[in-house]
């Protein structure tokens, strides 16, 4: 899986009658964490327990990732989270029009979708073109879904994600009338005149004294 670089944003607005479950809005949510499995995907020296000394093992500053364990945890975590959110919404997987998952790994997404009984038409995938953009992946995938006409007014849309910790979350909502982006921008980034190695060298130079 290759990581991508991107950004996304979603703008919410209040609805006229929050008590009207037949109208647009959030129908069900689920959020959770399992610290017992945290060691399967972690950077040991980050956080309050990190070792800020020059004698630390450099390997502990890198991402430790147990691929097979993370695969199983992610698939099961997203399935259970989606089911709980749907249950709180009084719905089932048969009611879902589109799932927009965190684009971490296509195999994980397809495995979870298959076990939920979802067809390819019910799942938004864009990791093949954008890579894993981390927190930006769901808004970017939603943008692509809107651009390609895969979200219609009144659709039941599910967002679901998992991450380090390990953590997971899902949201079930009924889509409103707007099925196009708020607008487009012609803004452009300034040309980059340094390499990634040069940027990292500057970071190492800045942070090195903190580890002595």
Go through the PLM ranges and name each one.
Residues 75, 79, 86, 97-212:
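Claisen-condensing/thiolase-fold acyl-transfer catalytic domains that form or cleave C-C bonds
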Residues 70, 85-89:
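Short helix-to-loop capping/linker segments positioned immediately adjacent to catalytic or ligand/cofactor-binding
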Residues 1-72, 76, 80, 174-212:
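Condensing-enzyme catalytic core mediating Claisen C-C bond formation in acyl metabolism
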Residues 90-95:
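Short, surface-exposed connector motifs at secondary-structure boundaries
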Residues 17-20, 89, 149:
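Alpha-helix termini
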């Amino acid at each position: 899986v290759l990581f991508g670089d991107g950004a996304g944003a979603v703008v919410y607005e209040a609805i006229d009658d929050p008590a009207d479950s037949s109208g647009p809005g959030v129908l069900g949510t689920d959020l959770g964490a399992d610290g017992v499995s945290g060691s399967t995907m972690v950077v040991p020296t980050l956080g309050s327990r990190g070792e800020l000394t020059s004698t630390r093992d450099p390997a502990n500053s890198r991402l430790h990732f147990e691929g097979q364990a993370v695969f199983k945890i992610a698939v099961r975590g997203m399935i259970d989270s989606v089911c709980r959110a749907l249950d709180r919404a009084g719905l089932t997987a048969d009611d879902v029009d589109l799932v927009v998952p965190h684009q971490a790994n296509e195999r994980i997404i397809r495995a979870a979708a298959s076990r939920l009984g979802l067809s390819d038409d019910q799942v938004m995938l864009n990791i093949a073109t954008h890579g894993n953009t981390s927190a930006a992946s769901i808004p970017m995938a939603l943008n692509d879904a809107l651009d390609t006409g895969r979200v219609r007014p009144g659709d039941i849309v599910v967002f679901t994600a998992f991450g380090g910790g390990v953590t997971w979350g899902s949201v079930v909502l009924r889509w409103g009338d707007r099925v196009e982006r708020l607008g487009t921008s012609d803004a452009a980034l300034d040309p980059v005149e340094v390499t990634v190695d040069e940027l990292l060298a500057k970071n190492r130079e800045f942070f090195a004294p903190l580890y002595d």
